[in-house]
């Protein structure tokens, strides 16, 4: 699968989901297209994808009000170097825990990834400069609700609710039912609590936007709860990243993107850190 764009037409709002190629982990970045401006969330990992995403933003022909970083994983923030070059002066908002993480570890992450991937990744990590406050905001006349969670799938993560548009962006907290999930922190109990909370909140949500792969529906929350429950059990039974990845592939033979579980196992067991 090559990179592509899925656009959700929600009457007075459009949500454009840029999805990187399968080779590049199907990473998602979002543009909320409002009547007169854009709210842009996440920036990709690889420079070519960030450039292509910037082209999408530019092609919409509206000013960018703000960037938002959904969580502290580098596959969602390294591309901000390119976006900030293309759209100078736009503030980047994130939860306090996300800002702290990028500030403390961003430079080391860039060094490590650049040693492996060279010019495919950014030369520096851009630290968000604006604190994202949880709660409800009206942006361009549209009601947004930002909800923050710590120590679940990531150290710090926001969920974006569009209460009037039956849409929720949960990013890496959930994955599509046919994919392996990224399990990079051993905080399984709390992650599962968060997922159950989101499932209860979902109500009439029709569009669920995940961090990797095409938009889906709320069935992905239940599928991720099932996956996380098994992941917790496997993590308690095996020794090391290789055994963990092998066991998860055996338990979920029908799920694709096996390299995702192999890579996330390296992070889960701190073979790769940060």
Tell what function each PLM region has.
Residues 55-136, 236:
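Active-site HxH/HxHxD metal-binding segment of metal-dependent hydrolases
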Residues 39-42, 66-70, 145-146:
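Short catalytic-loop micro-motif centered on adjacent basic/acidic residues
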Residues 20-22, 126-128, 148-151:
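Short Gly/Pro-enriched turn/cap motifs at secondary-structure boundaries
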């Amino acid at each position: 699968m090559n990179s592509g764009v899925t656009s959700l037409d929600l009457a007075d709002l459009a949500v454009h989901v840029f999805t990187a190629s399968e080779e590049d982990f199907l990473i998602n970045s979002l543009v909320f297209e409002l009547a007169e401006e854009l709210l842009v969330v996440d920036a990709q990992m690889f420079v070519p994808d960030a450039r292509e995403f910037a082209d999408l933003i530019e092609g919409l022909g509206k000013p960018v009000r703000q960037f938002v970083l959904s969580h502290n994983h580098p596959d969602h923030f390294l591309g901000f170097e390119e976006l900030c070059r293309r759209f100078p002066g736009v503030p980047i908002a994130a939860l306090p825990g996300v800002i702290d993480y990028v500030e403390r570890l961003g430079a080391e992450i860039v060094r490590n990834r650049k040693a492996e991937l060279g010019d495919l990744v950014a030369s520096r990590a851009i630290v968000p400069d604006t604190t994202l406050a949880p709660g409800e905001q009206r942006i361009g006349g549209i009601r947004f609700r930002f909800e923050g969670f710590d120590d679940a799938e990531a150290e710090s993560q926001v969920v974006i609710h569009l209460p009037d548009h039956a849409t929720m962006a949960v990013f890496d907290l959930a994955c599509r039912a046919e994919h392996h999930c990224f399990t990079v922190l051993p905080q399984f109990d709390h992650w599962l609590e968060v997922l159950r909370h989101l499932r209860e909140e979902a109500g009439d949500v029709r569009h669920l936007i995940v961090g990797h792969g095409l938009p889906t529906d709320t069935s992905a929350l239940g599928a991720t709860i099932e996956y996380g429950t098994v992941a917790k059990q496997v993590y308690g039974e095996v020794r090391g990243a290789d055994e963990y990845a092998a066991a998860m592939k055996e338990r979920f033979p029908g799920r694709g993107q096996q390299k995702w579980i192999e890579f996330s196992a390296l992070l889960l067991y701190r073979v790769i850190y940060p």
